[in-house]
Design a protein with these regions (language model features):
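Structural detector for internal amphipathic alpha-helices that build alpha-solenoid repeat scaffolds
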Residues: 6, 13-28, 36, 44-58, ...
Length: 187
């Protein structure tokens, strides 16, 4: 394991990427070492640890959630992407908070992970729509549109009257995906 972790943190992206299948093949025995590496001082080492955790079918969502609060935006983004591979409703609250991340990639990937989780994400996403900044509302509405849950219909209908063309677009997309593809507009 030590040799594989050395490859993973070698600073050479090709060597690091090539070490991941062997690390994953170790199964559950690799997870504790990767979680320890995810707390390393070096952001690049943390990123590669998250990358390897994302590839492992033995990684639990609960192990990835704390990494959404990492000090490095690239590690937060990797954690959100990892949660796309390991979606679980236990991550909904943390991912909902990550929609507000200053890093646009992290916020967008958090929205994608919420879509992968599906229906359990809807109450949090509806709450976000109540007063979040416009950029965050766009991410939330895009997620609601992709989840296709009827609980989002009132919010989508309300958004059709908003000034934002992007919000209107995602509301129309969501309504269309729900089979409500009529033209909605003010008379």
């Amino acid at each position: 394991m030590h040799a594989l972790l050395a490859e993973l943190t070698s600073g050479d992206d090709v060597r690091a990427e090539n070490s991941i299948p062997a690390i994953v093949e170790l199964g559950m025995t690799a997870i504790p070492a990767l979680l320890e590496l995810a707390r390393a001082e070096d952001a690049d080492s943390r990123w590669w640890a998250v990358r390897a955790l994302a590839a492992s079918p033995h990684t639990r969502s609960e192990e990835l959630i704390p990494l959404l609060s990492d000090s490095a935006p690239e590690v937060r983004a990797a954690a959100a992407l990892a949660l796309c591979n390991h979606p679980h409703e236990s991550a909904v609250d943390a991912l909902s908070q990550s929609l507000f991340d200053a890093d646009a990639l992290t916020a967008g990937l958090a929205g994608t992970a919420l879509v992968k989780i599906g229906s359990p994400s809807v109450p949090n996403l509806l709450e976000v729509m109540k007063g979040a900044p416009m950029g965050v509302q766009i991410l939330a509405l895009r997620a609601l549109s992709d989840i296709r849950d009827h609980r989002a219909i009132p919010v989508m209908m309300k958004v059709l009257n908003e000034e934002s063309a992007v919000l209107q677009y995602w509301a129309q997309e969501g309504l269309q995906k729900l089979g409500l593809d009529m033209i909605y507009g003010k008379p």
